[in-house]
A protein has these predicted regions:
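Histidine-acidic metal/acid-base catalytic patches
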Residues: 5-8, 14-25, 29-41, 47-65, ...
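Glycine-rich, proline-tolerant flexible connector loops at the mouths of alpha/beta enzymes
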Residues: 71-88
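Short, Lys/Arg-enriched N-terminal segments with co-localized hydrophobic residues
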Residues: 1-3
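Active-site beta-loop-alpha junctions enriched in small/polar residues
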Residues: 45-47, 73-77, 103-106, 132-135, ...
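Active-site acidic/histidine proton-transfer and metal-coordination neighborhood
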Residues: 18-20, 24, 32, 69, ...
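Mature catalytic domains of secreted/periplasmic carbohydrate-active enzymes
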Residues: 81-82, 90, 100, 161, ...
Length: 289
């Protein structure tokens, strides 16, 4: 392949190539083995019924299982600052962290972003992740989502917060000849994390390993949710019992993706919520060991 003239290399392309080189060199230096222990947490939507009944008791139970961090989802924005401080104290007392939160699209609006920012800072979060965007019929619609993420990234940067995007299955399905997830990746700042939901990626027929390798340094968080093609099971399969090739995913994430933390997510199973969370963590540790 002929070398690309520097004059035609965009800033975004240059940064992407630089990130690829960095992670390639890191992989060589480590002998293609993980160079550090990546924490594993729980997306608290997995225990949503328990969380609604007893937020602090549920977080305590999750920490006792051995989870190292938690990801709060949209209802956290209903908290007062005092409630957020109480939760942060609990996290500190338990020795666990909140590295990210899941947010509705309007949390990034002018009317809500300040409160979301302040609560995330109290919790110690690094990333405000856009958890869902309604399917768009045109690429222009998805480009506007990318613009929203870029704008939020600029507003949150002074507070030390970054932005992320969490995929569902719809982003892998072509619109006007291109996958929306590619539009988001190519039109957002390199600082915008691409949080990979493995289960929805698999459901859409996409390859999570290929996606990680195509976006070096940007897959800083992964939702470790499995998926079964059995329509009676789907996302309710336990971690490790579905279609995902977790060893290949972990290797790609740690040698190419720049993963900083894993999050187990479960949308239900044949067991109660807390038992499901415990079983998934045990399976994760066995697979990732």
């Amino acid at each position: 392949m002929a070398a690309m003239p520097y004059s035609k290399l965009s800033r975004r392309s240059f940064l992407a190539l630089s990130a690829a080189l960095l992670w390639a060199l890191r992989g060589v230096a480590s002998g293609l083995a993980p160079s550090r222990k990546i924490p594993v947490g729980l997306e608290l939507y997995s225990v949503r019924d328990e969380l609604q009944k007893d937020p602090q008791g549920t977080v305590r139970a999750v920490a006792k299982m051995g989870y190292q961090d938690v990801e709060f989802y949209a209802p956290y924005l209903e908290w007062s600052e005092a409630q957020a401080k109480d939760m942060r104290k609990l996290l500190d007392d338990l020795g666990i962290h909140c590295y990210s939160t899941h947010n509705d699209e309007d949390f990034f609006s002018d009317s809500k972003i300040q409160k979301a920012r302040d609560l995330n800072k109290i919790l110690g979060s690094r990333y405000m992740v856009l958890a869902w965007s309604d399917p768009k019929p045109t690429l222009d619609g998805w480009t506007k989502v990318a613009q929203t993420l870029n704008s939020a990234a600029e507003k949150l940067a002074p507070a030390g917060l970054k932005v992320g995007y969490h995929n569902h299955d719809t982003e892998w399905k072509a619109v006007e000849g291109k996958r929306p997830i590619e539009v988001i990746a190519s039109n957002t700042k390199p600082s915008v994390m691409l949080q990979l939901d493995v289960g929805t990626c698999l459901e859409a027929g996409a390859d999570p390993v290929a996606w990680i390798k195509a976006n070096p340094g940007r897959i800083r968080s992964i939702h470790c949710k499995d998926w079964s093609p059995d329509p009676n099971v789907g996302y309710k399969t336990l971690f490790g019992e579905g279609k995902a090739d977790w060893k290949a995913i972990f290797q790609a994430a740690e040698n190419h993706g720049g993963v900083e933390f894993y999050l187990i997510e479960q949308e239900g199973s044949r067991y109660p919520e807390l038992e499901t969370a415990r079983r998934c963590l045990e399976a994760f540790r066995s697979t990732h060991a």
